[in-house]
Amino acid sequence: MSEKEQQEQQNTSGNGVEKIRTMIEGFDDISHGGLPVGRTTLVSGTSGTGKTLLSLQFLFNGISFFDEPGVFVTFEESPSDIIKNAHIFGWNLQRLINEGKLFILDASPDPEGQDIVGNFDLSALIERLQYAIRKYKAKRVSIDSITAVFQQYEAVGVVRREIFRLVARLKQLNVTTIITTERSEEYGPVASFGVEEFVSDNVVIARNVLEGERRRRTIEILKLRGTTHMKGEYPFTITNDGVNIFPLGAMRLTQRSSNVRVSSGVKTLDGMCGGGFFKDSIILATGATGTGKTLLVSKFLQNGCVNNERAILFAYEESRAQLSRNAYSWGIDFEELESQGLLKIICTYPESTGLEDHLQIIKSEIAYFKPARIAIDSLSALARGVSNNAFRQFVIGVTGYAKQEEITGFFTNTTDQFMGSHSITDSHISTITDTILMLQYVEIRGEMSRAINVFKMRGSWHDKGIREYNITADGPEIQDSFRNYERIVSGSPTRVSIDEKAELSRIVRRFEDKQGSDS
């Protein structure tokens, strides 16, 4: 074990409770350093929540990162099935068994059935487990699942007593243990058969809740006795590497802020934003369908690639062929940029997987491709069929990771209203973004026009005017403000007479404001 790993492993909280790192992505963040050493943690959840995987990954990571042998006790699956299933995650358990680093104690029921004679007793199992722990010098133990024991035997009180003996012996042996158990409801009693009464040092609850039309996995640390942890539920997903928790509450606003500007790809828009977007900012273009949001995204990505910056487009509404065709009509060759290795386009249906999986895909692609710019078209597509809280957590996860990696992000959001004012706060994303571009349709003199406005821009002067916005063969063309109209945002533009003296004063004030922000 390296010196760094030893320091990580011997993580002790301020009140003296030593913790053992699980190295499960995100878990050590929400548990403030891992699980208390020498204690038993109950992991409770309904079927399909990932309890077995979590307990097995705890052992595998202990061996892989800290060279700590482990013992896995199975009351349900056979050892051969466990070894086979682990191959999905690239874990060669058989090799670890052959090397004497892992021992699987088979306590699964006999498929031929068995007759119970006399009182139920776990003495033989406890002795076998103690022998294995001492023989392999195990530091970690996982038991999956004690619910199976209760289901096999009717004497619930006797089984509780025997499980209590098992837990007490594990504590004497000073091994850190995870015990899994079933629960009947996602938001009901902690566990079936009152298990939490005798395994009460630490309790973790895994859930797999149906929200709308999609299932969403979350994990909650109910308690870690004698030490601190983060409160509440945190989303997680199961990837090719195992359990991956998104500790959104552990994110800190410590990222650096850049004063460097990057171009939007539209010269007039850069001027409206005081010289362009800030390098590590998050931009949101919101408006009805057809207002030109994807066009702005395309120009933004093209500009990055022209400056030899890598960029990724995550598209959830249009196919690759459709995006390339539309971009080509504006003079942007996506296929050529992809062939140069500067652009990557990832298209998928929002409903193809859960938000947590989409977030994991985005993070993985960013880590692999290392772009300077990313775009998501559109966030509103991902919001379909999910709760507001789940969607907000997703947006926080994406924006937080982008800022951490100092990436400029450009997101689009499609509003429900075709014309008139619309709320950009209902989607819970307006406060998270740094710059908001509001696009909308305006009816003037019996003709339909488009309007664009820099609604918000943190830390910078920006044009407050509402400008006419056309889409031409060369891309977006932003013209002058609607000077002689008011109530454009409300969808009921009214022509007003111009006071030339007042207009001149307004122009002077605008010039002075801009000069002040540039100095």
From Swiss-Prot:
Residues annotated for Mg(2+) 2 binding in this entry: 294, 317
Domain KaiC: 1-246, 260-519
Claim: Thylakoid is one of the keywords in the record: no
GO molecular function per UniProt: ATP binding; ATP hydrolysis activity; DNA binding; magnesium ion binding; protein serine kinase activity; protein serine/threonine kinase activity; protein serine/threonine/tyrosine kinase activity
Means of activity regulation: The interaction with KaiA enhances its phosphorylation status, while the interaction with KaiB decreases it.
Binding site for ATP 1: 48-53, 223-225, 227, 229, 239
PTM characteristics: Phosphorylated on serine and threonine residues by autocatalysis. Has a 4 step phosphorylation cycle; the autokinase acts first on Thr-431, then Ser-430. When Ser-430 is modified KaiC switches to an autophosphatase mode, acting first on phospho-Thr-431 then phospho-Ser-430.
Source domain of life: Bacteria
Gene3D superfamilies (alphabetical): P-loop containing nucleotide triphosphate hydrolases
Enzyme Commission (EC) number: 2.7.11.1, 3.6.4.-
Gene Ontology process terms (BP): circadian rhythm; regulation of circadian rhythm; regulation of DNA-templated transcription
Reported cofactor(s): Mg(2+)
Modified residues (Phosphothreonine): 431
Binding-site positions, Mg(2+) 1: 52
CDD domains from the UniProt entry: KaiC-N, KaiC_C
Subunit relationships: Homohexamer; hexamerization is dependent on ATP-binding. The KaiABC complex composition changes during the circadian cycle to control KaiC phosphorylation. Complexes KaiC(6), KaiA(2-4):KaiC(6), KaiB(6):KaiC(6) and KaiC(6):KaiB(6):KaiA(12) are among the most important forms, many form cooperatively. KaiC interacts with SasA, activating its autokinase function and leading to RpaA activation.
Described function: Central component of the KaiABC oscillator complex, which constitutes the main circadian regulator in cyanobacteria. Complex composition changes during the circadian cycle to control KaiC phosphorylation. KaiA stimulates KaiC autophosphorylation, while KaiB sequesters KaiA, leading to KaiC autodephosphorylation. Clock output pathways impact the RpaA transcriptional regulator. KaiC enhances the autophosphorylation activity of SasA, which then transfers its phosphate group to RpaA to activate it. KaiB and KaiC together enhance the phospho-RpaA dephosphatase activity of CikA.
Protein name per Swiss-Prot or TrEMBL: Circadian clock oscillator protein KaiC
Organism encoding this protein: Nostoc sp. (strain PCC 7120 / SAG 25.82 / UTEX 2576)
Lineage per the UniProt record: Bacteria, Bacillati, Cyanobacteriota, Cyanophyceae, Nostocales
